[in-house]
Each structure stands twice: as C-alpha cells, then as structure tokens.
C-alpha cells in the first residue's frame, strides 16, 4: 500500500506579491525551498490562513535571500499581499517507509525570516 505523506512544509510565510498575469505557479525564495526540501517545479498545496482558501500549484525559485512569496496566475485570486500561508509538498511511499518518515518543516516570523527547522510537528495538546 502507498501512503501520501507530508514531505516539506513552509509554516506561516507571508505573501509578498501577487501577479495575476504571470504564467502560473508560486515563486518562493530558494533558501525557503531548500529549508523545506521542496524542489523547483514540484507540486505544492497552499493553505491561506487569512481567507481559508486551499489551492494547488507548483513551486518556482525566487532569488535566494529575497524572502519572496509570490502567488501567480489564477492562484493570485486566492491571496493578497500580506496574507499568511502554509505551503506543503507531499510524497507517496510504501506503508512501511511511511511509518518512519519525518517531514522537513520550516518556521517563519512575520517578516518571512526563517526562525527554525524541524523534522517533526509538535504534538497538539488538549
């Protein structure tokens, strides 16, 4: 059996620009992609914390160190500059491998500064 697992996550990044007329995709600072292990042209799901929109696109690299998160093409209708996003990439793997899998998670502050990375998500407490 194959399972779909979280592979990489950018947690709480802010949109820096939107471009409705760009060909599509989401441009992401190359440092951010590296931190979460997301590759250029990889499929990503984006969850907009501010408006509840959930949409899929693919990642393209923005200039390293730029802190850019640019939502482009039709997806630009799903976000505004300043919106808070969670960006995820997933992987399929065999059940046995999935049981030992740990995602790469990158956490950001309100200025899109990388704060830390982790190989697991915290346990949610009651």
UniProtKB/Swiss-Prot annotation:
Q: Which organism is it from?
A: Sodalis glossinidius (strain morsitans)
Protein localization:
Cytoplasm
Q: Which residues bind substrate?
A: 57, 73-75
Cofactor dependency: pyruvate
Protein's recorded name: Aspartate 1-decarboxylase
Q: Which family does it belong to?
A: Belongs to the PanD family.
EC top class, in one word? lyase
**According to the record, how does the cofactor bind?**
Binds 1 pyruvoyl group covalently per subunit.
State any single GO MF term.
Answer: aspartate 1-decarboxylase activity
| Record pathway | Cofactor biosynthesis; (R)-pantothenate biosynthesis; beta-alanine from L-aspartate: step 1/1
PANTHER family per UniProt: ASPARTATE 1-DECARBOXYLASE
